């Protein structure tokens, strides 16, 4: 999931440099959403995984 967020972030940066505003905005939005999902899953797995150890 983190790789998808990084991929969309790179697409957004390249699109912004080349001047494709709509594509850059969409890719940035997707990257932000994926990053937030990844962060929530990471924190949840960290806290729930501590009880097993």
From Swiss-Prot:
It is a multi-pass membrane protein. The chain crosses the membrane at residues 4-24, 29-49. It is found in: Cell membrane. Coiled coil: none annotated. GO terms for cellular component: plasma membrane. Pfam families: DUF1328 (PF07043). The keyword Signal does not apply. This is UPF0391 membrane protein PSEEN0090.
